[in-house]
Amino acid sequence: MKIRVVAVGRDRSGLYAPAVDEYAKRLGRYLRFELVEVPEARKLAGTPGAKGEEGAALLAKLGPRERVVVLDERGDELTSVAFAERVRRWMERGQDVALLIGGSDGLAPEVLARAEERLAVSRFTLAHRLARLVLVEQLYRAMTILRGEPYHK
C-alpha cells in the first residue's frame, strides 16, 4: 500500500517544509509515502478559474485505482485514534490512497466529486501548507498508534 499526499503549492516561506520532510522520512519506515506538489494558479488567484486549474492538476496526478480522500472543512472530524483506525482499514484493503489538499481557494467541484472520503483536520480554518504539516504528522502518529509505539501518549 502507498499513501500519497497530493497538494497545491509549495512552502516558499520554508516554515513548514522541514517538518513535513521529517515526518515524511519517518513515515517511510512504515509504508510507502510520497508527497506530490502541483502548482498554484497564481495568475488566477481568487477567481473560479483558479480552483478549476488547480483541480485539473490534482486530478491529473491520480492513479486510476487510488482511493481519493480530500481534506475539506466539511469533512469527517476524527480523533487521532479514529484516524489511525481509518488508516488501518485502508491498509487492510491494500488499496493505494491519495490524500488531496487544495490551494487557498479550496477544491474544485470536480475534485470533490471524485472523492470517496472527506476529512477535516480541524474546525479551525488552516493555511493549506499548515494543513499539509498537520496531515503528515497525523499519518505518522496513526502508524505509531497502530504499532503500539510510544509517540502517541
Swiss-Prot record:
Enzyme class: transferase
Broad class of the protein's primary localization: cytoplasm
Molecular function terms from GO: rRNA (pseudouridine-N3-)-methyltransferase activity
GO CC, one annotated term: cytoplasm
Gene3D superfamilies, alphabetized: 3.40.1280.10
EC number: 2.1.1.177
Alphabetical list of InterPro entries matching this protein: Alpha/beta_knot_MTases, RlmH-like, tRNA_m1G_MTases_N
Compartment(s) of residence: Cytoplasm
This protein's UniProt keywords: Cytoplasm, Methyltransferase, rRNA processing, S-adenosyl-L-methionine, Transferase
CDD domains cross-referenced by the UniProt entry: RlmH-like (cd18081)
Residues binding S-adenosyl-L-methionine, per UniProt: 71, 102
Swiss-Prot/TrEMBL catalytic activity: pseudouridine(1915) in 23S rRNA + S-adenosyl-L-methionine = N(3)-methylpseudouridine(1915) in 23S rRNA + S-adenosyl-L-homocysteine + H(+)
Entry function: Specifically methylates the pseudouridine at position 1915 (m3Psi1915) in 23S rRNA.
Protein family according to the UniProt entry: Belongs to the RNA methyltransferase RlmH family.
Quaternary structure and partners: Homodimer.
Protein name: Ribosomal RNA large subunit methyltransferase H
